[in-house]
Amino acid sequence: MFIIELIKGIILGVVEGLTEFAPVSSTGHMILVDDMWLKSSEFLGSQSAFTFKIVIQLGSVFAAAWVFRERFLEILHIGKHKHVEGENDQQRRSKPRRLNLLHVLVGMVPAGILGLLFDDFIEEHLFSVPTVMIGLFVGAIYMIIADKYSVKVKNPQTVDQINYFQAFVIGISQAVAMWPGFSRSGSTISTGVLMKLNHKAASDFTFIMAVPIMLAASGLSLLKHYQDIQIADIPFYILGFLAAFTVGLIAIKTFLHLSNKIKLIPFAIYRIVLVIFIAILYFGFGIGKGI
């Protein structure tokens, strides 16, 4: 039985790693795979299962941090990315504009404020199957609109051409994506495209902006719930974390490689199909009614 539970932990880590940064909603997939199928709460307990989801999310976040480690070092002016010794202000200003720490902070502000004000409310009232289906569907429509608009944009911007206003607006869309199922990456990439970024630039900024705020949010949640972790369940947590981290590395690199080629509409169609599938299970067969 213990082996079966470990396998379930690995499966959940894989699902988290595949979906956390893809524009398909990790929440929707965790409801489908865990709450409707594997039911980790039955062998971990509801509180410990919630903490497990925080841990595997951290695995995905660390994967994104690793993929973008060079960019983060550059943003923080660490190591070889710091200013050249003796370089004057005029020389610095003459360099091409680069994404900097202020862009990231400006993008984080809306979600940070909303999270501090409404995190408990969202956790208690919006994590139901119907609300997640709404988020999945509305987010899919938004992605389709963004992709249709992007066809009309000539010479879309790169990530280093983002200005502070664009960063703030994309940050607002990250705050909107706190509605479960809407998808953080789906929302922010769509908004970035609507703000005349190319898909790769919007994806890059989405991940760069998401890492610090998700680390902070998941870290705080883990501090609040760490006492729910049982010693006997630690192998379950470790395997789930490692699965999410490993699969997350592969998924993020693959998505970034394909982001300018396959766009958002295929993901939007997939989300609509997912909504229909979950709706059939929920309304037709009563699966997940207790969620």
Swiss-Prot record:
Membrane topology according to the record: Multi-pass membrane protein
Location within or outside the cell: Cell membrane
Residues annotated as transmembrane: 1-21, 48-68, 102-122, 126-146, 162-182, 203-223, 231-251, 267-287
Pfam families xrefs: BacA (PF02673)
GO biological process, one term: peptidoglycan biosynthetic process
Primary residence: membrane
Function: Catalyzes the dephosphorylation of undecaprenyl diphosphate (UPP). Confers resistance to bacitracin. Is also required for virulence.
Protein name: Undecaprenyl-diphosphatase
Species name: Staphylococcus aureus
Gene name tied to this protein: uppP
